[in-house]
From Swiss-Prot:
Main location: endoplasmic reticulum
GO biological process: protein insertion into ER membrane by stop-transfer membrane-anchor sequence; tail-anchored membrane protein insertion into ER membrane
Role description: Part of the endoplasmic reticulum membrane protein complex (EMC) that enables the energy-independent insertion into endoplasmic reticulum membranes of newly synthesized membrane proteins. Preferentially accommodates proteins with transmembrane domains that are weakly hydrophobic or contain destabilizing features such as charged and aromatic residues. Involved in the cotranslational insertion of multi-pass membrane proteins in which stop-transfer membrane-anchor sequences become ER membrane spanning helices.
Protein name: ER membrane protein complex subunit 2
TPR repeats: 108-141, 143-175, 176-209, 210-246
Family recorded in the similarity comment: Belongs to the EMC2 family.
Gene3D superfamilies: Tetratricopeptide repeat domain
Membrane association type: Peripheral membrane protein
Localization per Swiss-Prot or TrEMBL: Endoplasmic reticulum membrane
PROSITE patterns the record matches: TPR_REGION (PS50293)
Organism from which the protein derives: Dictyostelium discoideum
SUPFAM superfamilies for this protein: TPR-like (SSF48452)
Keywords: Endoplasmic reticulum, Membrane, Repeat, TPR repeat
Length: 322
């Protein structure tokens, strides 16, 4: 369940400011700036593993005595996780011993870190055993449940992952990433109706994020039928309304609303294939989508991709059907 999914524009600006400050420090190590950067990342629940492992490791090994006691150990945990993300299994062992000497081997926070280290070494059975023992004492421990889901997913045991994720969402009902993860599991099983239920929970909690309207439209399209195709068009169109293409000329990269344009074309084409009498507004929308798709592709893509898009438009053309 990605923690970067909910990164806001203000968070992004703040992170860039911190990173630029660290880079501009040159050869000197500004431990205060690094401390503040890691503190911001913890508070925002954002993982920047390369940054944290590179600078945080030096912070906790050479400047640990300058950190407040609680923050120092919080930072150690943060650095351990970042190092594991980056494939470093040596430094986490040293830092783990420091945690264990402070809190004891039976501490829940120490057990969590131990399980993460085991998991990163592919000792999954041992890691699951620790997470299970934690949950027996603390049934609502979020990290243990999330790691169980991740392990079961990695093993291809989606039914078990769904079971744990359902239990997790009974406690943490507003976790958007968890609902998105659960919807993807159900889509893997072609359970589109159940996936839509999960995505409804996402839309209720994030009604202005255009990406989630695209995600909701996709299972609707997969279900098929005139009603679902019509609904899919509406959700794809609303995604465009929330992520307006009006300033496309100012972009130096392909716009992010392309999936919505593709979705509109496929949904309206499928309606036509079903013999549905298209409305005038749908015909105009189809024409607009085709024209914009071709314009965008010509601006940002090579000739090979342009030819592919032209072929796609020709194969889904409803205006010159024989």
């Amino acid at each position: 369940m990605s923690e970067m999914l909910m990164l806001t524009s203000s968070d992004s600006i703040e992170i860039n400011r911190y990173e630029e400050g660290i880079r501009n420090s040159g050869r000197s190590f500004n431990w205060v700036l690094v401390r503040d950067t890691l503190r911001f990342l913890r508070k925002s629940k954002i993982r920047k593993s390369n940054l944290v492992s590179k600078y945080g490791l030096k912070l906790v090994t050479q400047y640990f005595n300058k950190l407040e006691d609680q923050e120092g150990y919080d930072t150690i945990e943060q650095v351990i996780v970042a190092c594991l993300d980056c494939g470093d299994h040596t430094n986490p062992k040293k830092l783990f011993e420091q945690l264990k000497s402070k809190f004891g081997k039976d501490s829940v926070r120490v057990q969590r870190i131990h399980a993460l280290c085991l998991e990163s070494n592919n000792q999954l059975a041992e890691a699951l055993q620790i997470f299970e023992s934690i949950l027996k004492k603390y049934p609502s421990d979020a990290l243990s449940m999330k790691r169980q889901v991740a392990i079961f997913k990695g093993q291809g045991n989606l039914s078990k992952a769904i079971q744990v994720l359902n239990a997790y969402l009974q406690i943490y009902m507003c976790d958007l990433e968890a609902w998105l993860e659960l919807s993807s599991f159900h889509i893997s099983y072609l359970s589109y109706s159940t996936a839509l239920y999960c995505l409804e929970e996402v839309l209720l909690n994030a009604p202005i994020n255009f990406v989630f309207y695209i995600k909701y439209a996709e299972p609707l399209y997969c279900l098929g039928g005139n009603e679902n195709y019509n609904s899919a068009v509406q959700y794809y169109t609303h995604a465009l309304e929330l992520n307006s293409p009006t300033e496309m000329d100012k972009l130096d990269h392909p716009p992010t609303f392309l999936p919505a344009i593709y979705g509109i074309i496929m949904s309206i084409y499928s309606l036509c294939e079903e013999g549905y009498q298209l409305k005038e507004s749908q015909l105009k929308l189809m024409e607009w989508a085709q024209n914009n798709l071709l314009t965008i592709t010509k601006k940002y893509s090579s000739n090979d991709k342009i030819n592919l898009v032209k072929h796609f438009i020709d194969s889904t053309d409803i205006f010159n059907k024989e």
